[in-house]
Design a protein with these regions (language model features):
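PP2C/PPM-type serine/threonine phosphatase catalytic domain
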Residues: 1-171
Length: 171
């Protein structure tokens, strides 16, 4: 797949250049299939579905918190303060073994996807995202304007970089 090829390219670059060793990246991508989307995810970049005025997380983070902490039964307060809370369990460019997670979701006109990096969803709460994506008269209406509003909200919350927001309207 294209994701596996990207992983191989990143690994080869890191192996051939010592300054790049240890680099990696997360990924979330969506394929529009008309009345549905197929979403691919590696790491902690996320896909959300906005439909009927509600925001729903589609992907599951590949992080220590999601894959180790929660199954151990640690409470949310402990997880939010845990020293391993930001540790990824999977990323492109880290290993030849790659766990690409795939999700298929049905959509309908008026719905859209939000693809985001942790620079956005790590700083802007789901409630804030929902308000920005909703029909609030204080928030611009086009998808491009909503993306800019999301990015500005992350910057206002202290996000210096790595803030990605992509909105894709359902067909």
């Amino acid at each position: 797949s294209a994701i596996e090829k990207a992983n191989a390219v990143i690994l080869n670059e890191a192996r051939s250049n010592p300054e790049l060793q240890g680099m990696g990246t997360t990924l979330v991508a969506a394929l529009d299939r008309g009345d549905s989307f197929t979403i691919a995810s590696v790491g902690d970049s996320r896909a959300y579905l906005w439909a009927h005025g509600e925001l729903r997380l589609i992907t599951k983070d590949q992080t220590w918190v999601q894959e180790v902490g929660r199954p151990l039964g640690l409470d949310e307060e402990t997880l939010q303060k845990h020293p391993l809370r930001h540790v990824l369990t999977m990323a492109l460019g880290v290993s030849e073994a790659l766990d690409v997670r795939l999700y298929d979701i049905q959509t309908e006109p008026g719905a859209f996807l939000l693809l985001s990096s942790d620079g956005l969803h790590g700083l802007v709460t789901p409630d804030q995202i929902q308000r920005i994506l909703g029909d609030d008269l204080e928030v611009p209406n086009t998808l491009q304007e909503k993306c800019l509003h999301l990015i500005n909200a992350a910057r206002a919350a202290g996000g210096p970089d790595n803030i990605t927001a992509v909105l894709i309207a359902a067909s």
